[in-house]
Amino acid sequence: LLSDKPLITFLPGSRKQEINKVLPELIKIQKNFSKYQFVVAGAPGRDMKDYSESIKGYSIPIIFDETYNLIRSSVACIVTSGTATLETALLGTPQIVCYKSSFLSYFIAKKIVDLKYISLVNIIMNKEVVEELIQKDCNVKKLTHSLNKILIKSDQIKNDYKKLYQILDKGGASKLTCDLIMQS
């Protein structure tokens, strides 16, 4: 890694289909942020071949077994929805949450579960703390716009994270999250 450039980490998920759907969009934004260096945090249980097709033609390091260090060292992360969104918040790094699946999977999930938010951070806080780019909104233009925004307003996100810590510190975060999901 280049120590003189601020780091932005991509966490494209742990499932092969997530990696294949999300990572190709994420890596395209590198060209819009030449003052930053980018890295992919390789998921546990995955290896280089799981990422090779998605990064073909791009020069981006994939680093395994260092996810928390990468998140801590980053000025921002772009995270596929899941537990990594909460982990990124707990480590204090501003993030954008993204998610892409097949149209049919998304359509079925949307009909079964009517949630206001998909990221654990936003669900627990019951407001948008981190921007969510879902399905067609997970594209180069919106990712670039959102990343520029959080690089500027990272203090607001970090302040909201402090409120999140307070909620989690009180205990019962699992029950609170379940209750909020059931209310939706």
Where are the language model's segments positioned?
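Nucleotide-activated sugar donor-binding and catalytic core shared by glycosyltransferases
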Residues: 1-184
